[in-house]
């Protein structure tokens, strides 16, 4: 058994693709419209679906906003240089909602960014580099 993907519903697929692909550097792996169901699925990730878990972006036509609730926490991404990554995200128009620094009660360096729908993306420093 292995993880294939996680699905999130998005209100504006173009904005979400711009965020995940242009700002976070993922690739659009595949995209398909389902006219009879009035939805579009787009899969994004950093590598082939056969070798990596990916994110499924589901856009239900005619729905532009979702209640994110309080059950879902975040998606986590490992980065080598969290400080420059946050700078690049900001430069491309992304929203850093928690600046890089040690996590509470620990030493792991983390930051949080937010996608166009308000989903939180945690960035975790994977190397020992700290500014």
From Swiss-Prot:
Q: Where is the VOC domain?
A: 2-126
GO CC terms: cytoplasm
Reaction(s) catalysed (UniProt annotation): (R)-S-lactoylglutathione = methylglyoxal + glutathione
Q: Entry's CDD domains?
A: GlxI_Ni
> Which GO biological-process labels does this protein carry?
methylglyoxal catabolic process to D-lactate via S-lactoyl-glutathione
Q: Where does substrate bind?
A: 9, 60, 74
> Which family is it part of?
Belongs to the glyoxalase I family.
- Identify this protein by name: Probable lactoylglutathione lyase
């Amino acid at each position: 058994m292995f993880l294939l993907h996680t699905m999130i519903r998005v209100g504006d697929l173009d904005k979400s693709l711009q965020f995940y692909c242009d700002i976070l550097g993922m690739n659009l792996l595949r995209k398909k419209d389902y006219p009879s169901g009035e939805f579009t699925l787009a899969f994004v990730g950093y590598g082939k679906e056969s070798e990596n878990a990916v994110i499924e972006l589901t856009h239900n036509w005619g729905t532009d906003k979702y209640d994110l609730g309080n059950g879902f926490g975040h998606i986590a991404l490992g980065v080598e240089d969290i400080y420059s990554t946050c700078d690049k995200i900001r430069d491309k128009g992304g929203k850093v909602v928690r600046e890089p620094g040690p996590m509470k009660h620990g030493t792991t360096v983390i930051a949080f960014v937010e996608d166009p729908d308000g989903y939180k993306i945690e960035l975790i420093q994977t190397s020992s580099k700290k500014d």
